[in-house]
Amino acid sequence: MSLTRLLIRDFRNIETADLALSPGFNFLVGANGSGKTSVLEAIYTLGHGRAFRSLQIGRVIRHEQEAFILHGRLQGEERETAIGLTKDKQGDSKVRIDGTDGHKVAELAHLMPMQLITPEGFTLLNGGPKYRRAFLDWGCFHNEPGFFTAWSNLKRLLKQRNAALRQVTRYEQLRPWDKELIPLAEQISTWRAEYSAGIAADMADTCKQFLPEFTLTFSFQRGWEKETEYAEVLERNFERDRQLTYTAHGPHKADLRIRADGAPVEDTLSRGQLKLLMCALRLAQGEFLTRESGRRCLYLIDDFASELDDERRGLLASRLKATQSQVFVSAISAEHVIDMSDENSKMFTVEKGKITD
């Protein structure tokens, strides 16, 4: 599935844009503040319902406008799909697919699996566990049809349980929540464990190509003790949870530990090496999806040249081309991406929110 056309209206500093896109590489070149990252963010928002630079909707809608409008056309092997997303200042969204309203953002996410690589993406490696849980959950979402519903229900039950912890005095009063919570927690943890085990070889192979000087290891931590039933953990920790007023153990505390030569990667790797590792993990995840389902990812890469020397940029470019996926790359100068260009790619110039090809 590739995005063949993108319409943007009142998004960030872009008043209006109508872009015919390449199914291969699409380059967005412009000075800082020109709007090239806004194009990437518009694509991301079309597939996620939210921007990646700001959670405040008022900052995403163009100044003095009431809403942004995004439309796209997705070309699959057998059919074309029209998609649209409108969001106003109150945060109300409208999702349209093939001319019909009432759809969910999760449907857009399923139609447009994408990988985002930005200068801020180091949080996957040096940020809290929630970023690595999101990495695993992306894979589970695209691999397990029931994952999103289970994950949504888990979040709801945890919120209710945490609220109840402020009011109850005996564990028996929590059993109605835990009766629902326990099977969901165990199922989600099983899916995450299976996914991390399935993708482990892909991650190791790709990381070895990008960072041959290190031995990288990956271990999934489910969020509570090994060999212990979740029901036992919840009951045993009731008094502590009640004092904390939140549930201290469970799938919401899971992590994917990543080590280089036995040490945490954030303590061992340079910024350039961390970016290479981040790129390797995103590539491995996209390639794993393609092998498992036949679906290709869409890759968004902001500020391609930062932190990478010519050799590493060339390696990343060759691996991206090998995926045969659609790729969007922003850069300050065309010189940084000209070597990646071929007869099928498109080069867009971005200046003060205006986009030309």
UniProtKB/Swiss-Prot annotation:
Main location: cytoplasm
Cellular compartment(s): Cytoplasm
InterPro entries for this protein: DNA-binding_RecF, DNA-binding_RecF_CS, P-loop_NTPase, RecF/RecN/SMC_N, RecF_2
Cellular-component GO terms for this entry: cytoplasm
Pfam families noted in UniProt: SMC_N (PF02463)
One example of a Gene Ontology biological process annotation: DNA synthesis involved in DNA repair
Keywords of the record: ATP-binding, Cytoplasm, DNA damage, DNA repair, DNA replication, DNA-binding, Nucleotide-binding, SOS response
Entry superkingdom: Bacteria
GO molecular function list: ATP binding; single-stranded DNA binding
Binding-site residues for ATP, renumbered to this chain: 30-37
PANTHER family assigned to the protein according to its UniProt record, in alphabetical order: DNA REPLICATION AND REPAIR PROTEIN RECF
Function: The RecF protein is involved in DNA metabolism; it is required for DNA replication and normal SOS inducibility. RecF binds preferentially to single-stranded, linear DNA. It also seems to bind ATP.
HAMAP family named in the record: RecF
Listed NCBIfam families: recf (TIGR00611)
Family, as annotated: Belongs to the RecF family.
Name under which the protein is recorded: DNA replication and repair protein RecF
